[in-house]
């Protein structure tokens, strides 16, 4: 499964078009997840099995980043909080007894912005 910011949807748009396409990029996670076009190799890997591609908005990303700080003391950048935003915002709802793992990486956050 992939999760992207709604304002930087390079894979989501490529899946909809059936091929990599250029997209406009902006938003809180653009500096880390703001590829204008998904690469050919990434697109091929994403389409090798039935893809699930989700979008989350900036407000959900910032809320998830703040929750990660408040609940776990993880100082994540917006891009790293995007997958967590899908879980906390409801874009992704795990099946009963499903195990979900998130990889959180990135060091591009200003601690002064954490709430």
Q: What is each residue range found by the language model?
A:
Residues 39-97:
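Active-site-adjacent helical/loop segments in soluble small-molecule enzymes
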Residues 1-48, 89, 93-115:
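Glycine-rich phosphate/pyrophosphate-binding loop at beta-loop-alpha junctions
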């Amino acid at each position: 499964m992939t999760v992207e910011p709604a304002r930087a949807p390079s894979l989501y748009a490529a899946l909809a078009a059936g091929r990599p396409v250029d997209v406009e990029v902006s938003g809180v996670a653009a500096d880390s997840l703001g590829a204008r076009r998904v690469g050919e190799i990434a697109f091929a890997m994403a389409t090798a099995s039935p893809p699930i591609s989700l979008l989350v908005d900036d407000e959900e990303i910032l809320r998830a980043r703040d929750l990660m700080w408040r609940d776990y003391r993880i100082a994540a950048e917006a891009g790293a909080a995007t997958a967590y935003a899908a879980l906390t915002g409801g874009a992704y709802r795990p099946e009963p007894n499903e195990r979900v793992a998130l990889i959180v990486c990135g060091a591009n956050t200003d601690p002064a912005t954490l709430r």
